[in-house]
């Protein structure tokens, strides 16, 4: 091996060893609201201006921005800092809340993979580094707020992708139940885009009780393993990847019972892992999410096309279609 090749391999090894630094630094910038500050300012800002607006001292802010500029997150010209097309995706209205959720102690400490967890099938998410139950940790309250904000941001982005790239999904549909809707962000955005649709946000009673009102959306509390409100269509957005195959089949059967046999459909909005070598720009992201599921959810996973077909067949659906909405998720429409 020549010296240059060896040096390159060493550099790659160091990049892997320190790979956690980039998302950590980006999370710090989001926590300081740097993307929002630059976006709202409407133009480049000096270090002094950015320091005053963020409340972060100049020296550490300079070092943080230097790192993120090197990695292409922000831009700098004539000693002024500015947004890039990438950094705009980390504002509060985009993926900023998701970055903050990943930075909470409850998420960051336990979600790393370990050999022990892979051998035993034990979810690291339910244990802190001290071996205690993370859900009872005082930090969990903050984590749940961050989690809700992250899911809201994700729902907003995914609903926008559906509206933009697959509006035909709601042709002839008069009512839609969003199962596991939390505070109704996704169904609210869809009803706003397709005002003839009556939206039903369905989640556990204690969750919908805290939901703000949304025009065109009714909030219903219940348990998806017992029954699902009836509608022309049932939507499962980022729900089934949390559950085992058996539980998914149970959920899908309950959804099938809720729709008309002649015109109804179940819309699954979730990732599809590609194993055939032909992927798209989100293929790596989906594999990363599967690693998170491997560490976080003992039974959950991101599924391949064959695995989705198996679930649909076992749940009694006769046919299905798949639509690429140019997002991390696809829309799988299953028919009785």
Curated annotation (Swiss-Prot):
Active site positions: 241
Similarity comment: Belongs to the class I-like SAM-binding methyltransferase superfamily. Cation-independent O-methyltransferase family.
Binding-site positions, S-adenosyl-L-methionine: 140, 203
Stated role: Flavonoid 4'-O-methyltransferase involved in the biosynthesis of polymethoxylated flavonoids natural products such as nevadensin and salvigenin, aroma compounds which contribute to the flavor of sweet basil, and exhibit pharmacological activities such as anti-allergic, anti-oxidant, antibacterial, anti-proliferative, and anti-inflammatory effects.
Class of the enzyme per the UniProt entry, highest EC level: transferase
Tissues expressing this chain: Expressed in leaves.
Phenotype upon changing residue 181 to G: Increased ability to use cirsimaritin (CIRM) as substrate and to produce scutellarein-6-methyl ether (SCU6Me) from scutellarein (SCU), acquired ability to synthesize pectolinarigenin (PECTOLI) from SCU, but slightly reduced efficiency toward scutellarein-7-methyl ether (SCU7Me)
Pathway the protein acts in: Flavonoid metabolism
Regulation of its function: Substrate inhibition by genkwanin (GENK) at concentrations above 10 mM.
UniProt EC number: 2.1.1.-
Alphabetically ordered keywords of this record: Methyltransferase, S-adenosyl-L-methionine, Transferase
GO molecular function (one): O-methyltransferase activity
UniProt entry tagged with the keyword S-adenosyl-L-methionine: yes
Name of this protein: Flavonoid 4'-O-methyltransferase 5
KW Methyltransferase (keyword) present: yes
Annotated catalysed reactions: genkwanin + S-adenosyl-L-methionine = apigenin 4',7-dimethyl ether + S-adenosyl-L-homocysteine; cirsiliol + S-adenosyl-L-methionine = eupatorin + S-adenosyl-L-homocysteine + H(+); cirsimaritin + S-adenosyl-L-methionine = salvigenin + S-adenosyl-L-homocysteine + H(+); scutellarein 7-methyl ether + S-adenosyl-L-methionine = ladanein + S-adenosyl-L-homocysteine + H(+)
GO biological process assignments: methylation
InterPro entries membership: COMT-like, O_MeTrfase_dom, Plant_O-MeTrfase_dimerisation, SAM-dependent_MTases_sf, WH-like_DNA-bd_sf, WH_DNA-bd_sf
Subunit structure: Homodimer.
Record's description of how this protein is used: Nevadensin is a selective inhibitor of human carboxylesterase 1 (hCE-1), a key enzyme responsible for the hydrolysis of a wide range of endogenous and xenobiotic esters.
């Amino acid at each position: 091996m020549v010296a240059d090749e060896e040096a390159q391999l060493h550099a790659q090894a160091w990049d892997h060893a320190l790979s956690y630094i980039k998302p950590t630094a980006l999370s710090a910038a989001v926590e300081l609201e740097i993307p929002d500050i630059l976006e709202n300012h409407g133009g480049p800002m000096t270090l002094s201006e950015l320091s005053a607006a963020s409340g972060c001292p100049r020296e550490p802010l300079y070092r943080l921005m230097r790192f993120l500029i090197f990695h292409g997150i922000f831009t700098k010209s004539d000693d002024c800092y500015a947004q890039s097309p990438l950094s705009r995706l980390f504002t509060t209205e985009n993926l900023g809340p998701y970055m903050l959720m990943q930075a909470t102690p409850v998420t960051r400490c336990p979600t790393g993979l370990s050999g022990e967890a892979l051998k035993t099938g034990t979810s690291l998410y339910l244990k802190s580094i001290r071996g205690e139950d993370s859900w009872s940790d005082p930090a969990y309250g903050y984590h749940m707020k961050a989690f809700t904000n992250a899911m809201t941001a994700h729902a907003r982005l995914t609903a926008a992708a559906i509206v933009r790239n697959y509006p035909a999904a709601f042709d002839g549909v008069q009512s839609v139940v969003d199962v596991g809707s939390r505070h109704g962000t996704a169904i609210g955005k869809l009803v706003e885009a397709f005002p003839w649709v009556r939206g039903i946000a369905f989640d556990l009673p204690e969750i919908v009780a805290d939901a703000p009102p949304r025009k065109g959306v009714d909030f219903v509390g219940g348990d998806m393993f017992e029954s699902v409100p009836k509608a022309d269509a049932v939507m499962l957005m980022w729900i089934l990847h949390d559950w085992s195959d058996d539980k998914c089949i149970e959920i899908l059967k309950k959804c099938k019972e809720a729709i008309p046999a002649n015109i109804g459909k179940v819309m699954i909005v979730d990732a599809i892992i590609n194993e055939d070598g032909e992927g798209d720009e989100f293929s790596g992201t989906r594999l990363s999410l599967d690693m998170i599921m491997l560490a976080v959810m003992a039974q959950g996973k991101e599924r391949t096309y064959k695995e989705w077909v198996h679930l649909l067949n076992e749940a009694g659906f006769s046919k299905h279609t798949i639509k690429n909405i140019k997002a991390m998720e696809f829309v799988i429409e299953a028919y009785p």
